[in-house]
């Protein structure tokens, strides 16, 4: 790092931060610094994978922190729809969101994204949509560009190499505090006490930094609203059971409202021919899924998440989600895996019982156990209702052999009060991406970064 003062300081090198920087570099006279608490993309390594052991509890977790953010090692799905992956249409016109999503997608293509797009077979999708409706499921059609984990990291590396020639990037640097004077952002202080001044500060810490951002917002008296808490399991089935759906739309976005509690349940992050993985955040192990273009398994995995909207006086949805994940850690030392058949019989899965399953677990480190000791009844019953409904359009999903991994929790629960240009009530302090609670995926997070950058450039041009 060459200087102590910048035009723009970006906190977080996930898609929101990266695309903010990419847009800002279109003007040669803007000095930009990206600060990232994790490693650069080439050095991000999960020891659990490289050493074939259990989770090493690295801090920060290489799976969710570092250049590229939590999505760097995902299977890289770009949902090219305004209805999926965020709430940007709450801030700007939906047509404008669609235009910016197309713009962001074009940038991914420039850096090497695959040109193939799923979800274009309208006739087949309409048939599936009708069948889903009869099963009391809502299929949300969306066009998806699938990068694959290998291609996703390759694209992120190209973006990093490009930006290194344009801006300053500092990895392994955790921000302690956003500095404010007279209700105006003026810079940041790192955990090592280094103070860096900036005319604009952009907070994009991702899911891993959502709690930190909430704490900062509270200090600055920025209003916070709670998003629903999403808690559930990662489901693993034979790939053939989901093949019809994944061939047509790649990722089936299905929504269901439970009969018993009227809770919203949804599928999330479907990974055809993928593998289940552990991710680690703030001392807690949870579960996720990846899929690769080159390396395929015989299974498909996806999350089933139950959304809960808490009301007054409860204000700690993130703590609630972490508490449930921590219960699984206490019982198993990490992630629990259970056959659906064992859950129905009211018994735990054992290593021996898992050998009777036709589904071979892809997360070898998961401990056979009993999820009914972890998940609240309301959440567990919602998951089972959802799987029964899905079985009507994908026979084989609700099978005694189906594997359930727990738990999966999404930590994007606090939504900051933002203007239409994603600025907080603190002047020149912007927030965007998953960490700010306004996006939930790669493409809308990327788009949110473009919105912020365009506003900063507009203000700079106005001052000239």
Question: What is the predicted function of each stretch?
Answer:
Residues 2-85, 123-464:
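Residues forming the flavin
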Residues 66-118:
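Dinucleotide-binding Rossmann-like beta1-alpha1 core, especially the glycine-rich loop
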């Amino acid at each position: 790092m060459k200087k102590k003062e910048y035009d723009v300081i970006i906190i977080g090198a996930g898609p929101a931060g990266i695309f903010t920087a990419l847009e800002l570099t279109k003007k040669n006279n803007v000095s930009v610094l990206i600060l990232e608490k994790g490693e650069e993309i080439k050095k991000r390594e999960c020891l659990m994978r490289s050493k074939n052991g259990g989770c090493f509890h690295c801090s920060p977790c290489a799976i969710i922190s570092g250049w590229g953010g939590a999505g760097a090692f995902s299977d890289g799905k770009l949902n090219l729809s305004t209805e999926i992956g965020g709430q940007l249409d709450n801030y700007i016109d939906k047509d404008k969101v669609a235009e910016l999503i197309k713009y962001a997608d074009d940038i991914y293509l420039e850096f090497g994204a695959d040109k193939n797009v799923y979800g274009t077979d309208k006739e087949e999708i309409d048939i599936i949509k009708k069948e889903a409706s009869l099963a009391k499921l809502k299929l949300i059609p969306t066009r998806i560009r699938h990068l694959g984990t290998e291609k996703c990291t390759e694209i992120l590396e190209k973006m990093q190499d490009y930006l290194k020639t344009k801006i300053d990037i500092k990895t392994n640097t955790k921000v302690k505090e956003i500095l404010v004077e007279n209700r105006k952002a003026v810079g940041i202080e790192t955990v090592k006490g280094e103070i860096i001044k900036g005319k604009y500060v952009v907070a994009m810490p991702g899911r891993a930094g959502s709690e930190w951002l909430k704490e900062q917002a509270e200090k600055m008296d920025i209003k916070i609203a709670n998003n629903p808490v999403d808690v559930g399991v990662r489901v693993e089935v034979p790939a053939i059971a989901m093949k019809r759906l994944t061939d047509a739309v790649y990722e089936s976005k299905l929504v269901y409202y439970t009969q018993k509690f009227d809770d919203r349940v949804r599928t999330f992050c479907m990974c055809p021919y993928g593998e289940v993985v552990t991710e680690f955040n703030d001392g807690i192990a949870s579960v996720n899924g990846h899929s690769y273009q080159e390396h395929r398994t015989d299974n498909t995995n996806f999350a089933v998440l139950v959304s809960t909207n808490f009301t007054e006086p409860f204000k700690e949805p993130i703590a609630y989600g972490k508490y449930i994940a921590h219960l699984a850690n206490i019982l198993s030392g990490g992630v629990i895996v259970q056959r659906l058949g064992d859950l129905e019989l009211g018994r735990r899965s054992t290593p021996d019982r898992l050998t009777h399953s036709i589904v071979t677990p892809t997360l070898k480190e998961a401990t056979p156990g009993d999820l009914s000791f972890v998940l609240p009844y309301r959440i567990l019953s919602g998951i089972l209702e959802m799987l029964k409904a899905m079985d009507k359009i994908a026979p084989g999903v609700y099978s005694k052999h189906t594997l359930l991994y727990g738990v999966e929790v999404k930590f994007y629960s606090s939504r900051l009060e933002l203007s239409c240009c994603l600025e907080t009530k603190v002047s020149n302090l912007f927030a965007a991406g998953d960490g700010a609670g306004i996006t939930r995926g790669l493409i809308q997070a990327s788009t949110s970064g473009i919105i912020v950058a365009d506003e900063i450039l507009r203000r700079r041009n106005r001052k000239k």
